[in-house]
């Protein structure tokens, strides 16, 4: 490419519905693309996914193939991806300016997700602030499934409860739970990078290591951390098939009056998951919906 020395990157700008954000970020990361940002206006349903690709490594045919790989991710939602916009940009466009695409994000009536480098906007001064570094691309609260959990925590605060967060990602649910009154959060994720991101974000929020603990693994890792004790509330914002596969082991983590907030499921997956949970002895208290996504509030019978 003749302009490679002057223009070091291809920048992809792709308008997306909010339902697609985490799936597309996951796919880009899986393909080895780590320079990612999401530009959006808080509480709006559409945003722009941005990605920077080395121009010397991504020919036109490679970029076309990338879109071929991304388009199927929209199909389960009954959506189609918009046409991408590609432009060549200099190196400093990524290294210096990517943070400008992230903004403070109010959630519910009381919570504010604030990128770590931004000052607290005066209009949100009375909100509970959770500071996050979104550079890890593990979710910062903008996805509907995450917002459903955050809003459920606000609606029914876990005052004095011990909470477990299975599939914690960036740690945002656990931080919010502590802000809403939980006495301790034990978190786990099978992705070691997510564990590192959670620990880094815990430091940003100046959390005591005993109040927020995160380990690599799944249910067994949480159980080992508990050392025979139990939690009062389990947060689980992961895909419905994974919830279904793990549901039989939730009982070992929870107290007799324990509850689970199960998100990450599409609304049309909820009926099957409800049947599975009821067969395992759980009572489904409610289904909350946001767009195509649902959250099940379940408890022991």
From Swiss-Prot:
Keywords assigned: Cytoplasm, Methyltransferase, S-adenosyl-L-methionine, Transferase
A cellular component annotation (GO) from this entry: cytoplasm
Residues holding S-adenosyl-L-methionine: 146, 167, 189, 237
Alphabetized GO MF terms: protein-lysine N-methyltransferase activity
Cell compartments where the protein resides: Cytoplasm
Protein EC: 2.1.1.-
Any Pfam family hit: PrmA
PANTHER family from the UniProt entry: ELECTRON TRANSFER FLAVOPROTEIN BETA SUBUNIT LYSINE METHYLTRANSFERASE (PTHR43648:SF1)
Name this polypeptide is given: Ribosomal protein L11 methyltransferase
Species name: Prochlorococcus marinus (strain MIT 9303)
Gene: prmA
């Amino acid at each position: 490419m003749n302009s490679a020395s002057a223009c070091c990157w291809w920048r992809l700008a792709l308008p997306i519905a909010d339902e697609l954000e985490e799936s597309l970020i996951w796919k880009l990361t899986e393909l080895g693309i780590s320079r990612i940002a999401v530009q959006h206006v808080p509480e709006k349903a559409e945003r722009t996914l941005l990605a920077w690709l080395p121009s010397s490594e991504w020919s036109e045919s490679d970029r076309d193939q990338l879109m071929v790989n991304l388009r199927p991710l929209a199909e389960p939602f009954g959506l189609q991806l918009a046409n991408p916009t590609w432009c060549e940009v200099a190196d400093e466009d990524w290294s210096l300016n990517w943070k400008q695409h992230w903004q403070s994000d109010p959630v519910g009536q009381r919570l504010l997700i604030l990128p770590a480098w931004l000052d607290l906007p005066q209009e949100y001064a009375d909100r509970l602030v959770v500071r996050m570094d979104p550079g890890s691309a593990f979710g910062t609260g903008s996805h509907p499934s995450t917002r459903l959990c955050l809003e459920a925590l606000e609606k029914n605060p876990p005052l004095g409860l011990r909470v477990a967060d299975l599939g914690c990602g960036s740690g945002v649910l656990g931080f919010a739970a502590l802000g809403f009154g939980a006495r301790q959060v034990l978190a786990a994720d099978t992705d070691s990078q997510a564990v590192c991101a959670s620990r880094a974000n815990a430091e940003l929020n100046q959390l005591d290591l005993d109040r927020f603990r995160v380990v690599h693994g799944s249910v067994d890792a949480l159980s080992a951390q508990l050392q025979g004790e139990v939690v009062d509330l389990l947060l689980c914002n992961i895909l419905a098939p994974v919830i279904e596969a793990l549901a039989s082991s939730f009982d070992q983590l929870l107290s007799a009056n324990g509850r689970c907030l199960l998100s990450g499921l599409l609304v049309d997956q909820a009926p099957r998951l409800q049947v599975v949970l009821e067969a395992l002895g759980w009572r489904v208290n409610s289904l909350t919906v946001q767009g195509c996504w649902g959250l099940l509030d379940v408890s022991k019978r």
